[in-house]
Design a protein with these regions (language model features):
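Active-site acidic/histidine proton-transfer and metal-coordination neighborhood
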Residues: 16-17, 71-162
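N-terminal pre-domain/capping segments
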Residues: 1-97, 101, 134
Length: 162
């Protein structure tokens, strides 16, 4: 078993400083929780990777800063918004690959919607994220989060079968 830490543990410390904190605490496994689009730029990401490697820390996963937007921007019905956001998630997945991480964790859609959201729509959108992640060698993982669809184990079972 490996024990790791997420940079989110040190919020609102800037992500690179939070990673340095994880490294200085001698964690050998880490998650990077991005907090801003500028943190997805290659020079920034490569420097974090360099720091982690120098400290003997392996970054295994990332978490997009836009978790609170996934409900409307990835899983919502407005196609143009989805088209824009899928590009942002591609940048997250590319950053994950640069960091050596092969997992990207998402929250997904809220359990209670103002408008009904068919499960098939959710599953198709998630599958599209999986495809984009796969191109970067990254597995997109659904985190089970209270108040989100993923809080329901039966939903997750249906999602797995889809």
């Amino acid at each position: 078993m490996e024990i790791g830490a997420s940079t989110s543990c040190f919020y609102p410390l800037e992500t690179e400083k939070a990673l340095d904190k994880v490294i200085s605490l001698d964690f050998k496994t880490a998650e990077v929780f991005f907090n801003s689009p500028c943190e997805l730029e290659e020079p920034f990401v490569k420097q974090m990777r360099k720091n982690a490697d120098a400290g003997g820390t392996k970054i295994v996963s990332i978490h997009p800063f836009s978790s609170n937007l996934e409900n409307n921007c990835i899983f919502g019905e407005y196609q143009r918004r989805y088209d824009d956001f899928i590009g942002m998630y591609q940048k997250h997945f590319h950053a994950a690959a640069l960091l050596g991480a092969d997992i990207a964790v998402i929250h997904g859609a809220l359990a209670k919607q103002k408008r009904p959201l068919p499960e098939e729509h959710y599953f198709e959108r998630f599958a599209s994220l999986v495809d984009v992640g796969r191109r970067e060698g990254v597995r997109v993982c659904q985190e089970n989060v209270v108040n989100f669809r993923s809080q329901n184990i039966d939903f997750l079972k249906r999602m797995k079968k889809y």
